[in-house]
Structures are given as C-alpha cells and as structure tokens.
C-alpha cells in the first residue's frame, strides 16, 4: 500500500496515542493541528497539548489556529496537499471547506459504537446508561456532530468493575489499531461506508459537577452506574455533616430494606450500606474533604461517628 500523506488533528493524551501509531506506521504525518497552548497548573504557565509535545519531538510541523473558519487558515491547510486528515479529540469545528480539502476527506476516531452515543462524553454516558458494550467507530466526517458515515467499528465489553478511567485506557489502546486498519481500507478502496440510523442516535452531553450529586431516591443500580461513570471526574458525591463527601467505588448489595432513601442500613469495614429508591447500595471507597480517597474501613476509623446505622445522609435532592 502506498503511504498516505496525513494531516493529524487532535489535542489530549487520547489523541496523542493515535498520533504515535501513525508516526510508527509507514504513512507520512506531514502536519499536526492542535489547540493553542493553554495556561495550566498553579502558575498558569502556557502549556502545550500532549499532541503538540509529541509532534515537536518528531520534528513534525505544528499548526495551532484558534479557528479553522477563516480563509487564511483554510488556505494554509489546503497548501499542505494532504491525502487525508485524521481527527481525534481535536476540539475545533471543521467547516465543510476543510472537510472537503483532503483527497480522501477527513476521518474521525470516536470512542463509542455509533450511532449510540454521539457527542463529547460517549465513554461516560455508556457507563451511566448501563450499556453492556462500547467500542471505537472510525467515521467519515461531515458537517454534523458525529453524524458521518461509519467506516469501521471495533467492540469492547463493559465489565462490572470498569470506570470511565479504565474504559478510556482500553479504548485508547483499541483506537490506534482500528485507525490503521481503516486507513489501509481507504487507501485500497476496500471499505464500505455505512449510514447511521438516526433512530438509534443519542447525544452524550458533557458531565457536570451538579449531575454528580448522588440522588438516593434513584435505584441502587443507577447510582452504581453513575459512580463508575463519574470516576475519575467529576466524582460522585453526597453531603453529610456539612461536608461534601466523594464516592469513588460502590457495589449493589443483596440486602433488602424499606428504609427511606439515604438511610444508612449498616456500617462495617466491608462497606456502608445505604438505602436507595430501589435496593441498597454499598459504599466501598470514599473521600473526605481535603483527604485522599480511602477504603470505608479507614473512613470509619477516622469518622465512624458520622456513619452510624439509621443516620440519614444529607442530600439537597431530597
């Protein structure tokens, strides 16, 4: 297969994993587009994206326009004369003129099985909804939000102990192989594009800190899914004794209870059992204000008086 001249567009670590795979391949990465350097850390020092750092280390030209809507930036991109543009978590909207510039158009690596979860947070929403599988879709981009024709899909089962952090890592490993496979198929003309079924599409909205508040009137199953979806950010939490307490890990209990939602059923080193709107949820790992995440056994050693049975956990949602 003749090597493709590729423009790569991406910003975070997830994207950098895919850029590394392209660098290691026989294709030519002729330019990298990434978001402008941003202030980061306590000193608010301008910091390059992981994609920029990787590109610079391999002497690949880097472009950082604030927008691709203006003609000078579009002409600059067209002058590169790329065969294809690969987009992975870039963060800028590509207008139609840019999508149509490369000979083979622009393709995107999306962290879900389309059209199930379009949008910014497909990994988190798959967990939040209790999906049994996720995966990676390589898609031909159009002007819509993740609405383009699907070129290739890979599948990944969602395990009971998966969180957004673990799924992110698994998909970051799965995506680059899928991308290289899709590029080979495009170059050889062996890929068949598949239209998305609009009836099956959902929008994966970004998570919010407000959404991470645990509402004990929900079922134990839904709360268990939310805790996994919101790990590592923004982390599920409840309010108790005037403090915000984060919850990092839970499991669904086999205990039955008709106590009011939010009531502590039992508290031991094995976990704190809390009544919900349907079933009982066991809290396994929590984080007190200003402290590191700890096992419930350690939490009870420090603050056992906060979590005595029949105590009702405070929650503004109640």
Swiss-Prot record:
Residues holding (6S)-5,6,7,8-tetrahydrofolate: 112-115
Pfam families, A to Z: Formyl_trans_C, Formyl_trans_N
SUPFAM superfamilies: FMT C-terminal domain-like (SSF50486), Formyltransferase (SSF53328)
GO cellular component terms, A-Z: cytosol
Disulfide bond entries: none
EC number(s) given by UniProt: 2.1.2.9
Keywords, in A-Z order: Protein biosynthesis, Transferase
Reaction catalyzed: L-methionyl-tRNA(fMet) + (6R)-10-formyltetrahydrofolate = N-formyl-L-methionyl-tRNA(fMet) + (6S)-5,6,7,8-tetrahydrofolate + H(+)
Broad enzyme group: transferase
Membrane-spanning ranges: none
Family matches, as Gene3D superfamilies: Formyl transferase, C-terminal domain, Formyl transferase, N-terminal domain
GO molecular function, a single term: methionyl-tRNA formyltransferase activity
Family: Belongs to the Fmt family.
HAMAP family per the UniProt record, alphabetical: Formyl_trans (MF_00182)
Function in brief: Attaches a formyl group to the free amino group of methionyl-tRNA(fMet). The formyl group appears to play a dual role in the initiator identity of N-formylmethionyl-tRNA by promoting its recognition by IF2 and preventing the misappropriation of this tRNA by the elongation apparatus.
Listed name of the protein: Methionyl-tRNA formyltransferase
């Amino acid at each position: 297969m003749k090597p493709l001249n590729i423009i790569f567009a991406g910003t975070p670590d997830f994207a950098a994993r895919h850029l590394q795979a392209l660098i290691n391949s026989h294709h030519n990465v002729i330019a990298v587009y990434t978001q402008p350097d941003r202030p980061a850390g306590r000193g608010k020092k301008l910091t390059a994206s992981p994609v920029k750092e990787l590109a610079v280390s391999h002497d690949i030209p880097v472009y950082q326009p604030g927008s691709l809507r203006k003609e000078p930036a579009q002409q600059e991109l067209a002058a590169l004369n790329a065969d294809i543009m690969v987009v992975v978590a870039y963060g800028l909207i590509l207008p139609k003129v840019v999508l149509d510039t490369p000979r083979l158009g622009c393709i995107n690596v999306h962290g879900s099985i389309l059209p199930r979860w379009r949008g910014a947070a497909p990994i988190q929403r798959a967990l939040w909804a209790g999906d049994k599988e996720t995966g990676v879709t390589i898609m031909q981009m159009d002007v819509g939000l993740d609405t383009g024709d699907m070129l290739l899909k890979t599948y990944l089962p969602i395990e009971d102990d998966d969180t957004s952090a673990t799924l992110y890592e698994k998909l970051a490993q799965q995506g680059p192989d899928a991308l290289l496979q899709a590029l080979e198929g495009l170059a050889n003309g062996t890929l068949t594009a598949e239209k998305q079924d609009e009836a099956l599409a959902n929008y994966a909205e970004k998570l919010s800190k407000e959404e991470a508040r645990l509402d004990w009137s929900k079922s134990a199953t839904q709360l268990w899914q939310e805790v996994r979806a919101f790990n590592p950010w923004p982390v599920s939490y409840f309010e108790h004794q005037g403090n915000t307490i984060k919850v990092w890990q839970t499991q669904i209990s086999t205990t039955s209870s008709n106590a009011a939602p939010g009531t502590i059923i039992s508290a031991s080193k094995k976990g704190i059992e809390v009544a919900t709107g349907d079933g009982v949820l066991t809290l396994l790992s929590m984080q007190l204000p200003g402290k590191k995440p700890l096992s419930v056994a350690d939490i009870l050693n420090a603050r056992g008086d906060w979590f005595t049975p029949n105590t009702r956990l405070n929650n503004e949602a109640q």
